[in-house]
UniProtKB/Swiss-Prot annotation:
Its EC number is 2.5.1.72. GO terms for biological process: 'de novo' NAD biosynthetic process from L-aspartate. Belongs to the quinolinate synthase family. Type 3 subfamily. It catalyses: iminosuccinate + dihydroxyacetone phosphate = quinolinate + phosphate + 2 H2O + H(+). Gene3D superfamilies: NadA-like. The gene is nadA. It is an enzyme of class 2 (transferase). This is Quinolinate synthase.
Length: 374
């Protein structure tokens, strides 16, 4: 596949129409910021709901009405009666919320710079070109595309249009089973590690091939034709950082340590862990732990910090200690931005509203509905 012509058309950040934070808000002290957020929320009342992803910093989570993973928060958005949904997350999450909420509701992302790099690793132009190459390599086979929830609305729409669906980290294995009941081959996007871990779970570890959209030569037709699962070469920069050595080190430092990791981690890390699951699973695992147990957390550092605070009776440690990363995209949701968008709503002005194209939204909803039927 020749990708040379794509270079000027592709961007890892889908939303570039961001509004700069006014200087007044950049200079707010933490105390003044909190007071103004609380005052604006009091004035807006039930007209606004604030959602905070598990990976958000403490200053956002403390102002959130609901805290959870992206799918949990989208469901909370759909159930909310509020006119305004402020999403403390990243762009693909706000898109999903916009798709499933009522048309009368506005979904607001405090900072448009909160763009997930992994979601940006599978852009529509690349996927269209890859789909043409992959289907040409296996012309007599039915290929079912599956996209992880961590993707933009246009990719969700593409997968639905081609007969595929959306999945979460919790139901990826059921999505694969669904696809193989209807087709011969799966194209999984954008996270290769979740795809590989799911293939292992289904006993199909040797049936995969990795597709690098940036490699001009792509994969040979024979490699694609021989594989049952084509894995898009995308990944989470936070979770890819974890290594088996981190697991060994934490077990050496804590004799009775248990290790729980996210399935976006490398296969070798998943194999070395005691429990593997979504952020909801990680949260539940620590909540159910006996007092005095040690749990090493292999995911974004803010969730590990939240769990330490929420469950002081459990010894919660980051899997890679001080080297554990925060998510740079999540970090863009600064509490000063939250104060700004709230006070703008008080004045009747909506800032940074996420609006998915209606045709894309309709198709993406089909992919989400297929997931819900699993």
């Amino acid at each position: 596949m020749d990708t040379s012509s794509f270079e000027t058309d592709l961007s890892l950040f889908k939303y570039d129409d961001l509004e700069a934070l006014p200087d007044e808000y950049r200079e707010l002290t933490p105390t003044a910021r909190t007071e103004r957020i609380e005052a604006a929320r009091a004035e807006l009342g039930d007209d606004v709901v604030v959602l905070g992803h598990n990976y958000q910093r403490r200053e956002i989570v403390e102002h959130a009405d609901f805290v959870g993973d992206s799918y949990q928060l989208s469901k909370e958005a759909a159930n909310a009666d509020a006119d305004y949904v402020i999403f403390g997350g990243v762009t693909f999450m706000a898109e999903s919320a916009d798709i499933i909420t009522d048309d009368s509701q506005s979904v607001i992302l405090p900072s448009m710079e909160a763009s997930c790099p992994m979601a940006g690793m599978a852009e529509a132009l690349q996927v269209d070109a890859a789909w043409a190459d992959i289907t040409a390599a296996a012309p007599d086979e039915t290929i079912i595309p599956i996209t992880y929830m961590n993707s933009y609305a246009d990719l969700k729409a593409f997968c639905a249009e081609q007969g595929g669906l959306v999945c979460t980290s919790s139901n990826a294995h059921r999505a694969f089973e669904w696809a193989f009941e209807r087709g011969d081959k799966v194209l999984f996007l954008p996270d290769k590690h979740l795809g590989e871990n799911t293939a292992h779970r289904l006993g199909m570890a040797d049936a995969t091939v990795e597709w690098d959209p940036w490699a001009a030569e792509g994969k040979t037709a024979e490699e694609v034709a021989d594989a049952d699962i084509v894995l898009w070469d995308g990944y989470c920069q936070v979770h890819e950082r974890f290594t088996p050595e981190h697991v060994a080190e934490v077990r050496a430092d804590h004799e009775d340590a248990n290790v729980v990791v996210h399935p976006e981690c490398r296969r070798e890390v998943v194999e070395a862990a005691d429990v593997v699951g979504s952020t909801a699973t990680i949260t539940e695992t620590v909540a159910d732990a006996d007092p005095g147990e040690t749990w090493a957390i292999g995911t974004e550092i803010h969730l590990a910090n939240h769990l330490q605070r929420w469950h002081p009776e459990v010894n919660v440690v980051p899997l890679c200690g001080d080297a554990c990363m925060d998510c740079n995209a999540m970090r863009q949701i600064d509490p000063n931005y939250l104060a700004w968008v709230l006070e703008e709503l008080v004045e009747g002005r909506e800032r940074n509203v996420i609006e998915v194209d209606s045709e894309e939204a309709e198709l993406a909803q089909v992919g989400l509905d297929r997931m819900l039927e699993l």
